[in-house]
Amino acid sequence: HILVCGESGSGKTTFIKTLLYSMTRKHSSDQFQFYILDFSSHLLKIFRNLPHCGAVIEEDTVEQSMELFKLLTTIIQERKKLFSELEVSNYSEAAKLKKLPFILVVFDNVAGFLQTKAGQKQYDMLQYYLKSSVNYGVSYLFTISHVNEINMRTRQEFKQRIALQLRDRYEYTDILNVKCMYMPPELPGRGIYSYEGRPLEMQLAMFAP
């Protein structure tokens, strides 16, 4: 799972666009699929017509999120059964024996989703999905503007963390869960990510279709 935290305009949506563009260029829809819940800038609908894209859900279609979670539950249950039949314990081993697309579920501004009635109803289930899905080739990407938008129990499920243009080094420390002694320059797309327990400076790139 990937957690991206940054102030408004720091490049969170740009990160998602670049990641999805890169993945869809490298992998077919048999290898990689994604679902988007866009409660931010509504710029991610550009991916709607790609064969890799299962759905783009926004505020006016938020009720569809319930159907999405039902689908994801079915996928995980089917993969549990398949893994047992293949006698494997994780997605990497199973994918060597059978074509199984890696699935990424993207929440751009997860706090916006959680403020909806549908989001409030599904919050506890979302915790379950984060904990149980990654072993079966289903991962999540959350973007948040502040560390307090999701609780610590939820944050602990995210092993990959990226911080973009936060207010001070203490916020970087909180979100990355590693001690940060410096702040990156205030440049578009500049941030810090946690790598093997160390904070490393990074630079995002914008894709050009």
Language-model region placement:
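P-loop NTPase catalytic phosphate-binding loop
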Residues: 1-89, 95-176, 182-185, 196
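Conserved AAA+ ATPase small/helical "lid" subdomain
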Residues: 183-209
